[in-house]
A protein has these predicted regions:
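Single conserved hydrophobic/aromatic residue that forms the stacking wall/gate
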Residues: 1-8
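Extracytoplasmic
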Residues: 31, 38, 42, 52, ...
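A cross-kingdom feature marking solvent-exposed beta-strand/loop segments within repeated
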Residues: 24-30, 63-64, 112-113
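Acidic, glycine-rich low-complexity/disordered segments
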Residues: 80-115, 125, 129, 138-237
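Active-site loops and adjacent core secondary-structure elements that bind or stabilize anionic groups
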Residues: 11-12
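Extended amphipathic alpha-helical heptad-repeat regions
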Residues: 19-23
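Amphipathic, non-transmembrane alpha-helical segments in extracytoplasmic/periplasmic proteins
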Residues: 35-54, 120-141, 232-237
Protein backbone atom coordinates (compact mmCIF):
# COMPACT_ATOMS: atom_id res chain seq x y z
CA UNK A 1 0.00 0.00 0.00
CA UNK A 2 1.38 3.38 -0.99
CA UNK A 3 1.00 5.01 2.43
CA UNK A 4 3.23 2.39 4.05
CA UNK A 5 5.86 2.30 1.32
CA UNK A 6 9.40 3.46 1.81
CA UNK A 7 10.78 6.16 -0.44
CA UNK A 8 14.31 7.42 -0.91
CA UNK A 9 15.24 10.66 -2.61
CA UNK A 10 18.04 11.61 -4.91
CA UNK A 11 18.86 14.70 -6.93
CA UNK A 12 20.21 15.27 -10.40
CA UNK A 13 22.38 18.37 -10.20
CA UNK A 14 23.35 20.07 -13.42
CA UNK A 15 26.26 22.50 -13.46
CA UNK A 16 27.13 23.39 -9.84
CA UNK A 17 25.47 23.07 -6.47
CA UNK A 18 26.42 20.32 -4.05
CA UNK A 19 25.17 22.66 -1.30
CA UNK A 20 21.59 22.32 -2.49
CA UNK A 21 21.94 18.53 -2.60
CA UNK A 22 23.00 18.52 1.04
CA UNK A 23 19.91 20.54 1.98
CA UNK A 24 17.37 18.35 0.18
CA UNK A 25 18.64 14.77 -0.15
CA UNK A 26 17.39 12.40 2.55
CA UNK A 27 17.53 8.84 3.82
CA UNK A 28 14.62 6.46 3.07
CA UNK A 29 11.39 7.39 4.88
CA UNK A 30 7.71 6.46 4.68
CA UNK A 31 6.22 8.02 1.59
CA UNK A 32 3.28 9.48 3.51
CA UNK A 33 5.76 11.75 5.33
CA UNK A 34 7.23 13.11 2.08
CA UNK A 35 5.86 16.17 0.32
CA UNK A 36 7.83 16.46 -2.93
CA UNK A 37 5.92 19.55 -4.06
CA UNK A 38 7.05 21.42 -0.96
CA UNK A 39 10.64 20.21 -1.26
CA UNK A 40 10.70 21.23 -4.92
CA UNK A 41 9.46 24.69 -3.93
CA UNK A 42 12.11 24.89 -1.22
CA UNK A 43 14.79 24.06 -3.80
CA UNK A 44 13.41 26.71 -6.16
CA UNK A 45 13.45 29.36 -3.42
CA UNK A 46 17.01 28.40 -2.46
CA UNK A 47 18.12 28.93 -6.04
CA UNK A 48 16.63 32.42 -6.06
CA UNK A 49 18.16 33.29 -2.69
CA UNK A 50 21.59 32.48 -4.12
CA UNK A 51 21.09 34.36 -7.39
CA UNK A 52 19.97 31.54 -9.71
CA UNK A 53 16.91 33.38 -11.01
CA UNK A 54 16.74 31.28 -14.18
CA UNK A 55 16.95 27.99 -12.30
CA UNK A 56 14.27 25.33 -12.45
CA UNK A 57 13.26 22.43 -10.21
CA UNK A 58 11.12 19.34 -10.75
CA UNK A 59 10.62 15.85 -9.34
CA UNK A 60 9.57 12.37 -10.45
CA UNK A 61 8.32 9.39 -8.42
CA UNK A 62 9.91 6.18 -9.67
CA UNK A 63 8.37 2.92 -8.33
CA UNK A 64 10.79 0.08 -7.59
CA UNK A 65 10.05 -2.64 -10.22
CA UNK A 66 11.28 -5.33 -7.82
CA UNK A 67 9.31 -4.19 -4.78
CA UNK A 68 5.89 -2.51 -5.13
CA UNK A 69 6.18 -1.14 -1.60
CA UNK A 70 9.25 0.89 -2.43
CA UNK A 71 9.74 3.93 -4.61
CA UNK A 72 12.30 6.61 -5.30
CA UNK A 73 11.78 10.32 -5.77
CA UNK A 74 14.22 11.99 -8.12
CA UNK A 75 14.58 15.75 -7.87
CA UNK A 76 16.07 17.59 -10.82
CA UNK A 77 17.61 20.99 -10.26
CA UNK A 78 18.77 23.02 -13.25
CA UNK A 79 20.76 25.91 -11.86
CA UNK A 80 21.87 27.72 -15.02
CA UNK A 81 24.02 30.82 -14.47
CA UNK A 82 23.82 32.89 -11.31
CA UNK A 83 23.12 36.61 -11.47
CA UNK A 84 26.07 38.76 -10.42
CA UNK A 85 26.40 42.34 -9.21
CA UNK A 86 27.54 44.71 -11.93
CA UNK A 87 27.19 47.80 -9.73
CA UNK A 88 26.71 48.48 -6.02
CA UNK A 89 25.89 51.96 -4.77
CA UNK A 90 25.10 53.41 -1.35
CA UNK A 91 22.52 56.12 -2.02
CA UNK A 92 20.25 58.58 -0.20
CA UNK A 93 22.23 58.36 3.04
CA UNK A 94 22.34 61.35 5.37
CA UNK A 95 25.65 63.19 5.32
CA UNK A 96 27.13 61.84 8.57
CA UNK A 97 25.97 58.29 7.85
CA UNK A 98 27.30 58.45 4.28
CA UNK A 99 30.67 59.68 5.57
CA UNK A 100 30.90 56.75 7.99
CA UNK A 101 29.92 54.21 5.34
CA UNK A 102 32.37 55.57 2.78
CA UNK A 103 35.19 55.78 5.32
CA UNK A 104 34.73 52.05 6.02
CA UNK A 105 33.89 50.97 2.46
CA UNK A 106 36.80 48.53 2.47
CA UNK A 107 34.96 46.40 5.02
CA UNK A 108 31.85 45.92 2.88
CA UNK A 109 30.73 42.35 2.24
CA UNK A 110 29.26 42.93 -1.24
CA UNK A 111 31.54 43.33 -4.27
CA UNK A 112 31.05 43.90 -7.98
CA UNK A 113 31.12 40.52 -9.73
CA UNK A 114 29.90 38.54 -6.70
CA UNK A 115 26.88 36.28 -7.05
CA UNK A 116 23.61 37.70 -5.75
CA UNK A 117 23.21 36.20 -2.29
CA UNK A 118 20.44 36.88 0.25
CA UNK A 119 22.64 35.67 3.13
CA UNK A 120 25.31 38.23 2.24
CA UNK A 121 22.71 40.97 1.91
CA UNK A 122 21.58 40.31 5.47
CA UNK A 123 25.20 40.20 6.67
CA UNK A 124 25.85 43.60 5.06
CA UNK A 125 22.79 44.97 6.86
CA UNK A 126 24.27 43.75 10.14
CA UNK A 127 27.66 45.26 9.31
CA UNK A 128 26.25 48.71 8.52
CA UNK A 129 24.04 48.66 11.61
CA UNK A 130 26.98 47.71 13.87
CA UNK A 131 29.14 50.42 12.27
CA UNK A 132 26.53 53.07 13.00
CA UNK A 133 25.73 51.81 16.51
CA UNK A 134 29.44 51.97 17.35
CA UNK A 135 29.49 55.61 16.25
CA UNK A 136 26.61 57.10 18.20
CA UNK A 137 23.53 55.84 16.35
CA UNK A 138 21.97 54.13 19.36
CA UNK A 139 18.54 53.55 17.82
CA UNK A 140 19.70 52.19 14.47
CA UNK A 141 18.75 48.61 13.55
CA UNK A 142 19.61 46.31 10.58
CA UNK A 143 16.02 46.36 9.33
CA UNK A 144 16.37 50.10 8.65
CA UNK A 145 18.61 49.27 5.65
CA UNK A 146 16.77 48.96 2.33
CA UNK A 147 17.87 47.23 -0.90
CA UNK A 148 16.75 47.87 -4.47
CA UNK A 149 17.90 45.27 -7.02
CA UNK A 150 17.45 45.99 -10.75
CA UNK A 151 17.81 42.94 -13.02
CA UNK A 152 16.25 44.47 -16.14
CA UNK A 153 18.96 46.77 -17.50
CA UNK A 154 21.56 44.03 -18.10
CA UNK A 155 20.52 40.36 -18.46
CA UNK A 156 22.15 38.21 -15.80
CA UNK A 157 23.32 41.27 -13.86
CA UNK A 158 22.08 43.01 -10.73
CA UNK A 159 22.34 46.75 -10.16
CA UNK A 160 22.11 47.06 -6.38
CA UNK A 161 21.21 50.23 -4.51
CA UNK A 162 21.60 50.38 -0.73
CA UNK A 163 19.88 53.08 1.32
CA UNK A 164 18.12 53.76 4.59
CA UNK A 165 14.37 53.25 4.58
CA UNK A 166 12.31 56.41 4.06
CA UNK A 167 10.37 57.91 6.93
CA UNK A 168 12.75 56.93 9.74
CA UNK A 169 12.37 59.13 12.85
CA UNK A 170 15.01 61.74 13.62
CA UNK A 171 16.04 59.82 16.74
CA UNK A 172 17.33 57.03 14.47
CA UNK A 173 19.22 59.31 12.09
CA UNK A 174 21.18 61.37 14.61
CA UNK A 175 24.18 60.32 16.76
CA UNK A 176 23.81 60.23 20.54
CA UNK A 177 26.34 60.94 23.27
CA UNK A 178 26.71 59.41 26.72
CA UNK A 179 24.94 61.40 29.44
CA UNK A 180 24.60 60.36 33.07
CA UNK A 181 26.19 57.03 33.98
CA UNK A 182 24.45 54.84 36.56
CA UNK A 183 25.52 51.44 37.86
CA UNK A 184 22.95 49.23 39.62
CA UNK A 185 24.17 46.54 42.03
CA UNK A 186 21.50 44.17 43.34
CA UNK A 187 21.92 42.23 46.58
CA UNK A 188 23.09 38.61 46.89
CA UNK A 189 19.49 37.43 46.60
CA UNK A 190 18.71 39.91 43.84
CA UNK A 191 17.30 42.51 46.25
CA UNK A 192 16.83 45.88 44.54
CA UNK A 193 19.18 48.75 45.46
CA UNK A 194 18.26 50.78 48.53
CA UNK A 195 21.06 53.36 48.61
CA UNK A 196 23.34 55.29 46.26
CA UNK A 197 26.69 57.03 46.14
CA UNK A 198 28.19 59.50 43.67
CA UNK A 199 31.74 58.96 42.40
CA UNK A 200 33.09 61.45 39.84
CA UNK A 201 30.54 61.37 36.99
CA UNK A 202 29.05 57.98 37.96
CA UNK A 203 26.20 57.13 40.34
CA UNK A 204 26.26 53.70 42.02
CA UNK A 205 22.99 52.27 43.30
CA UNK A 206 23.47 49.39 45.73
CA UNK A 207 21.73 47.27 48.37
CA UNK A 208 22.96 46.92 51.94
CA UNK A 209 26.69 47.58 52.15
CA UNK A 210 28.73 48.60 49.10
CA UNK A 211 31.14 45.68 48.70
CA UNK A 212 33.29 47.08 45.92
CA UNK A 213 35.34 50.25 45.71
CA UNK A 214 33.79 52.88 43.42
CA UNK A 215 37.14 53.41 41.69
CA UNK A 216 37.23 49.75 40.64
CA UNK A 217 33.85 50.11 38.93
CA UNK A 218 34.75 53.46 37.42
CA UNK A 219 37.98 52.19 35.91
CA UNK A 220 36.08 49.37 34.19
CA UNK A 221 33.91 51.80 32.23
CA UNK A 222 34.94 52.07 28.58
CA UNK A 223 33.14 55.38 28.06
CA UNK A 224 32.68 58.75 29.73
CA UNK A 225 29.95 61.41 29.58
CA UNK A 226 30.21 63.27 26.28
CA UNK A 227 31.53 60.27 24.34
CA UNK A 228 29.57 59.06 21.34
CA UNK A 229 27.56 55.97 22.23
CA UNK A 230 29.24 52.73 21.14
CA UNK A 231 27.61 49.32 21.35
CA UNK A 232 31.07 47.73 21.30
CA UNK A 233 32.25 49.80 24.28
CA UNK A 234 29.04 49.04 26.15
CA UNK A 235 29.56 45.31 25.68
CA UNK A 236 33.19 45.59 26.78
CA UNK A 237 32.06 47.40 29.92
Amino acid sequence: EMTSSLVGSEMCIRDRGKWIFNKLASKPVFINTVNPEVRTKVAYNLLREYGYFNGATSYEVEPDPKNPKKAKISYKVEMNNAYTYDSIAYVRLRHRIDTLVQRNIGDRLLRDGDNFNVVQLEAERQRISSLLRNNGYYYFRPEFISYQADTIMNPGKVALRISTKPGLPRTVLRPWKIGDISVFLNGYNNEPPTDSIRYKDMTIFYEGKLRIRPKVLYDRLKFRPGDLYSQQQQEKT
